[in-house]
Amino acid sequence: MAQSVLVPPGPDSFRFFTRESLAAIEQRIAEEKAKRPKQERKDEDDENGPKPNSDLEAGKSLPFIYGDIPPEMVSEPLEDLDPYYINKKTFIVLNKGKAISRFSATSALYILTPFNPIRKLAIKILVHSLFNVLIMCTILTNCVFMTMSNPPDWTKNVEYTFTGIYTFESLIKILARGFCLEDFTFLRDPWNWLDFTVITFAYVTEFVNLGNVSALRTFRVLRALKTISVIPGLKTIVGALIQSVKKLSDVMILTVFCLSVFALIGLQLFMGNLRNKCLQWPPDNSTFEINITSFFNNSLDWNGTAFNRTMNMFNWDEYIEDKSHFYFLEGQNDALLCGNSSDAGQCPEGYICVKAGRNPNYGYTSFDTFSWAFLSLFRLMTQDFWENLYQLTLRAAGKTYMIFFVLVIFLGSFYLINLILAVVAMAYEEQNQATLEEAEQKEAEFQQMLEQLKKQQEEAQAAAAAASAESRDFSGAGGIGVFSESSSVASKLSSKSEKELKNRRKKKKQKEQAGEEEKEDAVRKSASEDSIRKKGFRFSLEGSRLTYEKRFSSPHQSLLSIRGSLFSPRRNSRASLFSFKGRVKDIGSENDFADDEHSTFEDNDSRRDSLFVPHRHGERRPSNVSQASRASRGIPTLPMNGKMHSAVDCNGVVSLVGGPSALTSPVGQLLPEGTTTETEIRKRRSSSYHVSMDLLEDPTSRQRAMSMASILTNTMEELEESRQKCPPCWYKFANMCLIWDCCKPWLKVKHVVNLVVMDPFVDLAITICIVLNTLFMAMEHYPMTEQFSSVLSVGNLVFTGIFTAEMFLKIIAMDPYYYFQEGWNIFDGFIVSLSLMELGLANVEGLSVLRSFRLLRVFKLAKSWPTLNMLIKIIGNSVGALGNLTLVLAIIVFIFAVVGMQLFGKSYKECVCKISNDCELPRWHMHDFFHSFLIVFRVLCGEWIETMWDCMEVAGQTMCLTVFMMVMVIGNLVVLNLFLALLLSSFSSDNLAATDDDNEMNNLQIAVGRMQKGIDFVKRKIREFIQKAFVRKQKALDEIKPLEDLNNKKDSCISNHTTIEIGKDLNYLKDGNGTTSGIGSSVEKYVVDESDYMSFINNPSLTVTVPIAVGESDFENLNTEEFSSESDMEESKEKLNATSSSEGSTVDIGAPAEGEQPEAEPEESLEPEACFTEDCVRKFKCCQISIEEGKGKLWWNLRKTCYKIVEHNWFETFIVFMILLSSGALAFEDIYIEQRKTIKTMLEYADKVFTYIFILEMLLKWVAYGFQMYFTNAWCWLDFLIVDVSLVSLTANALGYSELGAIKSLRTLRALRPLRALSRFEGMRVVVNALLGAIPSIMNVLLVCLIFWLIFSIMGVNLFAGKFYHCINYTTGEMFDVSVVNNYSECQALIESNQTARWKNVKVNFDNVGLGYLSLLQVATFKGWMDIMYAAVDSRNVELQPKYEDNLYMYLYFVIFIIFGSFFTLNLFIGVIIDNFNQQKKKFGGQDIFMTEEQKKYYNAMKKLGSKKPQKPIPRPANKFQGMVFDFVTKQVFDISIMILICLNMVTMMVETDDQSQEMTNILYWINLVFIVLFTGECVLKLISLRHYYFTIGWNIFDFVVVILSIVGMFLAELIEKYFVSPTLFRVIRLARIGRILRLIKGAKGIRTLLFALMMSLPALFNIGLLLFLVMFIYAIFGMSNFAYVKREVGIDDMFNFETFGNSMICLFQITTSAGWDGLLAPILNSGPPDCDPEKDHPGSSVKGDCGNPSVGIFFFVSYIIISFLVVVNMYIAVILENFSVATEESAEPLSEDDFEMFYEVWEKFDPDATQFIEFCKLSDFAAALDPPLLIAKPNKVQLIAMDLPMVSGDRIHCLDILFAFTKRVLGESGEMDALRIQMEERFMASNPSKVSYEPITTTLKRKQEEVSAIVIQRAYRRYLLKQKVKKVSSIYKKDKGKEDEGTPIKEDIITDKLNENSTPEKTDVTPSTTSPPSYDSVTKPEKEKFEKDKSEKEDKGKDIRESKK
């Protein structure tokens, strides 16, 4: 294969596929077969054998390098180009678009050979591009027909047409390809299976009557899937999807398992509870007296049978089944639930709690059987409407059961759902890695082609070198003259050279003469290019994969289809000049998954076209680009006049030939086609001079640089000819009409305008205008006064005017031609023209939406706001990459929508009365396509359960469950998680860090910088003036001045982010001698343009502000992309004098800056610090006290004492205790506090005590630490403020102001007290610090989201303001129909005529931007969004009564918002947090960064090793019977059978249901009894055999307890059920034992990885949980003090409210997942009558009224949701993702924990006394008893000896030595291991003090050598004896039989010895046994070679070992 690649292919590589070609292939196959037997073994092992070339796969486009296809060869069979198929019967066909199709060369259907005209015709049709288009159109039309809900009759015929076309397509394919026998035939492509099934079904349903046809007809929907097979990019995405589904199998198993366990627990706990209802009692119509109590008791026990005998007239069953007797809350379909425990829901007066009727929600929500319980838990896990289930269950069972939900939500929901995300994300990552690796591989092939070219041109090079001295000079200087293939490729572009190339190939003999001229040219070019590469640019540093040639050679195949390949992987970034951190992010990211050659380049021309594309200004260029462009811009030979030699093509791309941007893009062909304006080039050029100044100091480099420019010009011109797409007249037109420079005066005007418009201040002004304009738009609200709206409209006109003026002035200044070359300008122009159009159409009805286009102006901010820019880019990138995914998602949604409509549409119509009271279709139904689509979309948003209940009620359970589950799993869990994974991948810290336009300051920063400078200047002048006034301070002035100047210069030298700011201020830069090091000296070097001033504040990409000493700067860790690249510029700058701080380097300063050393090692000093800061002391002399004598000394001693007290850990413990107590006290202040007088008084006193204690603590700390230290610590500030709050409220109480509103609100701030606990708990502090670290970026994203949402909010205000008002009847709460009340005035009329009507608004609406935000938050969290959506869909106009679904397509506003506002922005939060998490880990996690992969593996193995030690096994009992039992019990089989029993026990528990018959109950009782007996038996057996050792094992104690409980439970079941949890629960706990068995099952590795990840994340999750609890605690107390008395409605009722601490916690836990927060917020939004009564009295309390405080309520809930839902929960996700990836790495490592455990388990058997030694003779058995990978199978003597294990006296070997040797064998040798090994031994010694200190006296190797020497001597002696014997015996040999018998063994001995010669230690290697992976060379080389090699190696190794031992 390799050879065939080497020939650079060209247009002459195409040959027709003829009969001869076929014969040749057949002959090759025959030869192969003949060769085969000999090489059989080799072939099998050769996994690195030839593989098909990925660029020539079927379906791809022909690589560019092959040139154009000769027209006569299009659509004709050609010989296969891919060398892999050289001996396979295939041929290819290329169509006009150069797409490759591969066919089998065997006969199709046994009849049609490849040369048959019918087949040829079929092939021609098949490959024709129109054929695909036809099929595509057919499918789309078919899809349109499928969306019809009641299709008319004529569609039947259309169906036949479709079927006909599909049949025709399949026939063509079958004729062209063959049916199914060979490769590349019809059925070999899985996509064709789909076609085949679809067609078969079409015919089957047509001719065979199969009953339920509609179900079968739904199969037609699968046709939509065919689009996937037709659009190429989609196949890959689907591939990725299928991959991730495969990967999900483990997670799915785990999920199902966990859910089953939880469902079992739920079944046991809540079985039948949800049927408890409030029954009216006594019955109102009762005419007789009944002793209620006795009756009631009977009824419960015998379900009413008891008294039916006594009273015939009253039928209990009927009574309780009658719905009307239950208690219903208004507007509810289900009766109110209740429970009989004290903390469950109580019934109102006159009702009792009875189990009756069906379960809630049509009976589908229950725990009555295992399957319903499972469904309920699945719903809990996906968190859909779970607050409903939560409330129902707590109401029926009691509030204590909240614990169950906490567990399920945290372990089940968060963990499992995020595992799914983690797995999908990892599958995606791997897919990405694969594409990158493929690209690397291509690059390697590419290098081979280069080599080939180099060889071809070598002779020519000599000639060329002689001819041109210049070129020789260059190649000499340039080092190795590597020829860039661009010489041949670039020239291949022009047709002239193409012919020459052909000639060259055909006439290889006359190679030299034919191409002489051209080659010389090429040589000159490549040689000089070489010099560029070496000196000017140094692109090809060693190790960099980005060699410069590749830029020019973009025409080559691999670069075309590579997408991201140019991006060097991270690990090379140190060596490569360009660090591509964001490698797939900036460029071509749409190709992350796709094979879209099409998307990258349409065809030949456009490829050529975009080879060198100048940059669009506004885009942030990847740093690599800017590097090159800087360097190239610095070249002096570039033309400086305003006019550049430029050429334009139709796309408006200007390429400035010879101009600076000729090289701007090293990644030319992959960049967005954009442009650069002249002014900008000028600006950039001046600003970037200094970059190449150093380069140009060197005369040779200067000369080279000059020649470089000319070369570029040549190459470019040659390219130019080949790439002008448009006819020349276009260019003339562009130059004439679009570039205006006609006359002098005009140019002057233009110049002036340019100066003004391009000034940074103008930019600043425009930005301010944009902000103001946005404000103006956001000020719209309802109702508005006339004046206000007129002000707004005038403002709008003004702003439109300003923006229009800006646009026209810019056009004048820049010429339209250049103006529209820049993205931002096009955007501006678009918006301005829209605004003007909108002004014209202002009065046209229905076009008001145009106003919302003004909102796009907000995006202009992105120009100067990096984060917004980044967000838009991320969304852009993702949308690119998501393009295909979105299509797939759309197809899935479409398919399910159609399936739903076809399957359930009719049932919705027929059974509508089941689900709707008025027999009208509800809003969510599947009767037509649009509504069906909405339901599917809603399921994708995660809301499936409610729509599914409706569906199950009308259309039957099984079908609905199946369809909804499929949508849920496929759509939501897989596709949406893939979405998220894509987002996370296009999101990375690099994008965050270096968002700024790479090295251009943006204009705003320049403007702000100028202002800053002005202010500084004024300040300095004033200061100087003051100082001059006081001459005595002259000296000070002299000191200050140079520093000031230095400071100003600092600004300038930091242009272009290159130099890092040093220190906080230059005053610190003293080197060791205390003199300030002269940065000035290096400053002069830079020629600085004024546009380069930089303010650090505005420049987010400079994150480093700490001085870094040279040694410690680690480029990997800096965030700015620049650094890693510029560090390499160092190499070339060694000539520069050392003082200069060359760019990118951290400035070389001798000693680290002051104040740095103490920071590194904070030593615990035992002395207090100074009280005040130095400045204070300087200003107020009185603060200086001598501590040597007098008062000062006393003071100092006092401080020391205080310091000791404060530092004492008892003090800390005491304070923590106090904090906890005071926090706890807050929890008592609920609404009942007034009734509990004693508690109230106690709390008041306690409060005072706490306050005094905290004040004392504060004073002590002040004295001990001093103000300076106390007030520089953030935690102390927190304490200080909280103490202040208590102090103020205390004082107020004392003065009698306690009833003041302000003081009351201050008291609520006491809720912050628990925050003080934060600094005291290590775990929480870690989490908080991590969070605080993330806050800046979270805030950034939050701001950006707000801007993003602002647009939707303003749009919502435009669409819906004031339209949500409606007229209702407030007694029933029903809305009047439009026929009754049509508008506001009619409603008013009703009100005046004393009707119970009211004109009312929806609480959450779009009347202003603030409320708009609230509504959008509800929509984005999918809570309460329904009401908003219904209101929007029903709205008509302001002051009109809404009408049902009048405005149906308003749904789309919400759909769009959910996609962009919710999916994107909320997931960005996850992105930011995960990202920050990783960055912080990098900051703190020191050791990993400095370890190689190998070391890491070894280190991890060792870490695990260290924690283990051999244990004494339980001795086998001496008693014979006990011994037998012992053997039986310790066998693995026993364990497994117990496991099986446990599982069976579970199954029997699953069978249990709530309404099972008596018989069933009895059966289950007996089965359970059997199990109890069996488990008791196990327990007894183990007790007998293990004796007292039984209790040393945790699991056994666990079993024992469970068994005891089961037995007790059997006898006392009734009693226990009454008071405790049902005993059956303990059986569930047994399931935990399954965890043990997982170790024994090989296949469960994946599941164990997942559990391992969970175990690893537990500590972190515990910390986050603690933090979350703290937040909940504080909010609960706030809630109690603010919302305790609000009206009970919507989500607030008798159980869920803020009245007591417990209730508040229950509510807040529910909102943690954002569930149901809208319901809790609604009552709080009631601000006055008639919604609530501000004067209402509450008995037992002085508070009046039940109104809420809307602003406090909104703040409370929104802040809580942001903190808990977005932050804490996402941290949870981040931890899990992190640990999952770690766990996966762990499981991928060769040695895991279990392997070591297994080692020690086996060890116990061989070393029963735990001596830690084993005898040498046992070693072989021991090694063979292990499991792989440590296993060394027998025969293993040789290998073990070769390991050279140290032995102690008595031939014993220590377990560690064995383990080390075995580990080394698995991991491979490595030098650094010895150090680690020593560490490990020390650690082992520490953990096992018992380890015998042993002196090895010999080693296995030495022992063997001694043995061998003995054997050699023996053998020589024996041989001598033998010879004697043989001589004697030979004469009488035949007679003497006995001797012969003696002789044979000796002979055998000799033979064995001969064999043994090969096994002496010197000669053998530790050849890996078959179990370990074979080393590749050892397999491929013949045996003999291997022995030879091994022999020598081993001898060396032996020597080394011996020497090291000495």
Swiss-Prot record:
Keywords: Cell membrane, Coiled coil, Disulfide bond, Glycoprotein, Ion channel, Ion transport, Isopeptide bond, Membrane, Phosphoprotein, Repeat, Sodium, Sodium channel, Sodium transport, Transmembrane, Transmembrane helix, Transport, Ubl conjugation, Voltage-gated channel
Catalyzed chemical reaction(s): Na(+)(in) = Na(+)(out)
Per-repeat ranges for III: 1191-1505
PTM comment, free text: Sumoylated at Lys-38. Sumoylation is induced by hypoxia, increases voltage-gated sodium current and mediates the early response to acute hypoxia in neurons. Sumoylated SCN2A is located at the cell membrane.
Modified residues (Phosphoserine): 4, 468, 471, 484, 526, 528, 531, 553-554, 558, 573, 576, 589, 610, 623, 687-688, 722, 1507, 1931, 1972
Site note Binds Mu-conotoxin KIIIA, residues: 330, 362, 917, 921, 946, 950, 1375, 1430, 1444
Binding partners and assembly: Heterooligomer of a large alpha subunit and a smaller beta subunit. Heterooligomer with SCN2B or SCN4B; disulfide-linked. Interacts with NEDD4L. Interacts with CALM. Interacts with TMEM233.
Disulfide bonds: 278-338, 913-919, 951-960, 1367-1387, 1732-1747
One GO cellular component term noted in the UniProt record for this chain: voltage-gated sodium channel complex
Region (Binds SCN2B), start-end ranges: 918-919
Bias (Acidic residues): 1156-1167
Cited function: Mediates the voltage-dependent sodium ion permeability of excitable membranes. Assuming opened or closed conformations in response to the voltage difference across the membrane, the protein forms a sodium-selective channel through which Na(+) ions may pass in accordance with their electrochemical gradient. Implicated in the regulation of hippocampal replay occurring within sharp wave ripples (SPW-R) important for memory.
Principal subcellular localization: membrane
Residue windows of the II repeats: 742-1014
Domain IQ residue range list: 1906-1935
Placement of IV repeats on the sequence: 1514-1812
Family matches, as Pfam families: Ion_trans, IQ_SCN5A_C, Na_trans_assoc, Na_trans_cytopl
Organism, scientific name: Mus musculus (Mouse)
Region (Disordered): 28-61, 494-529, 589-635, 1121-1167, 1934-2006
Site, as annotated: Binds SCN2B: 910
Listed GO MF terms: sodium channel activity; voltage-gated sodium channel activity
Protein name as annotated: Sodium channel protein type 2 subunit alpha
